[in-house]
Amino acid sequence: MIFRCCFEGCGKSFPRRAKLSDHLNTHTRSRPYKCDMCEKSYMKNGHLSVHKKKHFPPELACERCGYMCHTRDRLHKHQKACLEYKCGICGKRYRKRSWFDVHVESHHVKVFNAPRSKHVCEYCKFEFNKKSNLSTHVRSVHLLMKPFKCPCGKEYAHNASLDRHRKKCASWSYPGLDVAKPPAASNSLL
């Protein structure tokens, strides 16, 4: 069954009565969908649903920069503009982590493989007593790599930083491990 708009000159049709009802509100300027948490009202139920999410912390995060939002549409728009992976050596920017990693490995990998008796950073001349410490320094300071990842999406250059974060993060859990989690939100704040 098709549901047609009865307003003169409109002629739009809809597959469901609810969609027609929402459409009619655009003609009458009626706003029957009211938020039960604030005073805002909307012509369409879908707009109210999007609004209600704003009363709660955002759940969607950009994997590149950590930007948080409420809707997939907003996240998609953000990700189109987000060029968060920037090379700390040459300044090139990449939209995808995999492209950034390929760039680093193909253009700057000599830093990790150069034989030397002293372990000196080629970029800032800082000296290290171990090659592994130099590699960690270059990756985290100059290449801005963060290989240690939490299930919540945050990334860290050092495992110790991830360990500190893990003690506070509610997303981190393994069966059999007693991991400290933040206290539950109080209902009195709502």
Swiss-Prot record:
This is Zinc finger C2H2 protein ECU03_0790. Keywords: Metal-binding, Repeat, Zinc, Zinc-finger. One of its GO terms (molecular function) is DNA-binding transcription factor activity, RNA polymerase II-specific. A zinc finger (C2H2-type) spans 4-27, 33-55, 85-108, 119-142. InterPro entries: Znf_C2H2_sf, Znf_C2H2_type. GO terms for cellular component: nucleus. It comes from the Eukaryota. It holds the Pfam family zf-C2H2. Transmembrane segments: none annotated.
